[in-house]
Amino acid sequence: MNCSRNDVVLLPIPFSDLTSHKVRPAIVVGHAPDPRDLFVVPIPSRLQQATFPLRDWKACGLNVPSAVKGQLATVESRLIRRVTGHLGKADATQLDHHLRRWLGLQD
């Protein structure tokens, strides 16, 4: 599926024991060197598991208040089930700030 940066997507996330999976939302933050892969950041609905809450979660196509988890994953783009929405400007700016901090790219 064709996705862009800051798209909110649904994709299967495996359980830690790898016996099953559940479809969960994530934010596309970039394309990996392999064109079949994407970098994503998970969106948990449990706010206590997250780094910062999404201000405009409804525009992201989410059903409940949600947040961004400080975790980066690489996924195959073929696993994307659908695009549900797109981050608003304020949420995208906050995500960019946190990505730079998580990756040690701040001046």
Regions found by a protein language model. Give the residues of each.
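Conserved functional hotspots at enzyme active or ligand-binding sites that engage polyanionic ligands
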Residues: M1-D107
